[in-house]
Swiss-Prot record:
Entry keyword rRNA-binding: yes
GO cellular component entries: large ribosomal subunit
UniProt keyword Amino-acid biosynthesis, yes or no: no
Gene Ontology MF term list: large ribosomal subunit rRNA binding; structural constituent of ribosome
Superkingdom in the source lineage: Bacteria
Species the sequence originates in: Zymomonas mobilis subsp. mobilis (strain ATCC 31821 / ZM4 / CP4)
Family per record: Belongs to the universal ribosomal protein uL10 family.
A Pfam family reported for this protein in Swiss-Prot or TrEMBL: Ribosomal_L10
Name by which UniProt lists this protein: Large ribosomal subunit protein uL10
GO biological process annotation, one example: translation
Gene3D superfamilies, per database record: 3.30.70.1730, 6.10.250.290
Role description: Forms part of the ribosomal stalk, playing a central role in the interaction of the ribosome with GTP-bound translation factors.
Amino acid sequence: MERAQKVELVAGLKSAFAEAGVIVVTRNLGLTVAQSTVLRSKMREAGASFKVAKNKLTRIAVEGTPQAPLSDLLTGPTAIATSADPVAAAKVAVEFAKTNKKLEIVGAVMGTTLLDIAGVQALAELPSLDELRGKIVGLISAPATKIAQTIQAPAGQLARVFGAYAAKDAA
């Protein structure tokens, strides 16, 4: 790899890390191309990305940034999963690691916090931002729905009573 390519790769990693809510480091020793392709497509579906980069270049990219603790995790054949949603990359990586033993979670960085394997697994169990937004909208709209039902209930009951009297008089 030429120096210009390395500089470009480091710049790309820096911009990806700046936008990332979480950076998950995985060890992918023995992962086939087909398995890697499946993992990348699952990451893309979740709004995350999965990149294999040289550890030295990744260390240069995180140097002087809040994600600097990440460099402690970069040993051996590693790959980086990033996502703006703090849960997405961790969730996909943990789910894939459960079915494929060749992918090993090393750790992660969320903001300035270094997470170990247990921390990444705990993060993967949290609901995503979209799920949380859906729950909040449901909680906000539930009282309004109940109010509307309560207001409509007496009118419906009156209509049924009048209908019963009309049916009784007709009989």
